[in-house]
Amino acid sequence: MAKTKPPVNKNEIYTLTFEDLTHEGNGVAKIEGYPLFVPEVLPDEQAKVKVVKVNKNFGFGKLLELTKTSSHRVEPTCHVHCGGCQLQHMSYDLQLQMKQGQVHNVMKKVAHLDQVPVHPILGMEEPSHYRNKVQIPVGEKNGEVIVGFYQKRSHRILQNQDTCHIQDEAINEVLPFTRQLMNKYGIQAYDEKSHRGQLRHIMVRVGHYTKDIMIVFVTKTSKFPEKDRIIKELTEQFPQVKSIVQNVNDQRTNVVLGKKTKVLWGENYIYDKIGDLTFAISPKSFFQVNPVQTKVLYDKALEYANIDKDDVVIDAYCGIGSISLFLAQKAKKVYGIEVVPEAIEDAKMNAEINGMNNVEFSVGQAEKVMPKWKEQGLDPDVIVVDPPRKGCDVDFLEAMIAMKPKRIVYVSCNPSTLARDLRILEDGGFETKQVQPVDMFPSTNHVECVAELTLKLSN
């Protein structure tokens, strides 16, 4: 059978009317039924585009000129185009519609659960300046230290991108001042090609509610010339700085942080709150970057868990214990599991900070730990999972199914893997009751969800 040749060729130019959006936020137009995906174009817009890649079933294009614009188009607040904010040309209403549609679509096509209620997405009242953390590369140009995010799909630093409309405004003040200090005191930027130089990255973490600031300098060696003068100027300029840290990363790697961390000034941690709970945050802590929406997400997870005072709960992928402690406010006992030992140490400290003595944290892989707990007679009423983007391993899902909790609450940062895993849990004897999307990352194509499942009566 002859192969069907796509009706377009690379480098051809077309004027097209766009009709839809992909999950990534790319505009979709069709040429003789062949889909062409083009970034930064919206439905109902007409645009002149150049074909840049041709696959068998779809292609990609580049926007050359808009000839008709949508009422949903807005002027981007940032013109740097680092690739982090894929949707900043799109009205917030349309962003929410797109994300809602993505969740509906995977629930239908992947999970085959099109009858399950997907509630209207919970967006932000002020969808800007929400990120409480940045780790930004440092480079050199014409003998001057520069900082900025990498250009999309490259390691070229976009020079002196000191401000970002999704970063906490305190970060936007600290970064340019810090860059000026690096130049003032002659700090040499690291060059990843030659593996020479000193300063690799600058990380800034901010407590959204406490206003605490931590500054982390990631260096190639433990040497840090002029550090005392730099610290003096930083702490005088920003009294809310509570911690200045040096992290040493001597490897040729894209991983930002190395193994050795040393506090140069101040505290080991900064602190922030989610609801009534306080959390200690170290340079390496995984702490949700949008604490406002994290509270919304966790409140919904707690609602779906429907815990009473006699319930025993397992929190898999518990991290630094943030969800665990929310659950412990209602439950008789919470068991948290996490594979990263440092995260468990943070979790134990956070439990102590909040006076929680009904939480027990363990290091290990949940799929191996939970069967042992079951053998020891632990029968959880509720299991809460919050896995990485890849979703849950099949071994873990099978271990969870074998424990037969009354309810499962699945917190997800990837609707596609959520839908895949819901299908497995449905086939294992659980029923998906409802799904709640939450917009944790405005201006980006990411969407979080909380799903509630209950054990079917026949089980």
UniProtKB/Swiss-Prot annotation:
It comes from Oceanobacillus iheyensis (strain DSM 14371 / CIP 107618 / JCM 11309 / KCTC 3954 / HTE831). S-adenosyl-L-methionine binds at residues 288, 317, 338, 386. The active site is at 413 (nucleophile). Its EC number is 2.1.1.-. [4Fe-4S] cluster binds at residues 78, 82, 85, 164. Gene3D superfamilies: 2.40.50.1070, Nucleic acid-binding proteins, Vaccinia Virus protein VP39. Belongs to the class I-like SAM-binding methyltransferase superfamily. RNA M5U methyltransferase family. GO terms for molecular function: 4 iron, 4 sulfur cluster binding; metal ion binding; rRNA (uridine-C5-)-methyltransferase activity. One of its GO terms (biological process) is rRNA base methylation. This is Uncharacterized RNA methyltransferase OB0768. The keyword Iron applies. Residues 7-65 form the TRAM domain. Keywords: 4Fe-4S, Iron, Iron-sulfur, Metal-binding, Methyltransferase, S-adenosyl-L-methionine, Transferase. It is an enzyme of class 2 (transferase). InterPro entries: MeTrfase_TrmA_AS, NA-bd_OB-fold, SAM-dependent_MTases_sf, TRAM_dom, U5_MeTrfase_fam. NCBIfam families: rumA.
